[in-house]
Amino acid sequence: MLLRTKLLALAISAAFLVLPAGVSAESGFLADVDDLPLAPGLVEDPAARVVFDKPVGRIVEAAASGAVSAGAVTRFYAQTLPGLGWTARAGDAWVRGDEVLRLQVEQAGPPVIVRFSIAPKK
């Protein structure tokens, strides 16, 4: 009985150690933009990251991909970005303060690829 209780406690502890990592990966943010979430199912490509800090503002390029539809990704950002202070502009552009965010969603087949670009307004 004591052994069964210890094994149960160990299993529950292990579940709590693993669960936060899975939740974090599923609801992650871009590595270089801590307030720009990744749509569910997307994983950032570390090789695509480029960041420059300039006196006039930052320039960030990033990409993510996943087995999701382009429509689901577009809907996610259309619903999420306004709550983060971004205002939709023509095409794929969003504006917040002195920055412009561009989202390019490409689906030539699985996976969908999303390219993020943040630059100062001109």
Regions found by a protein language model. Give the residues of each.
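An acidic-aromatic pocket/loop used at catalytic or ligand-binding sites
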Residues: 2-6, 22-122
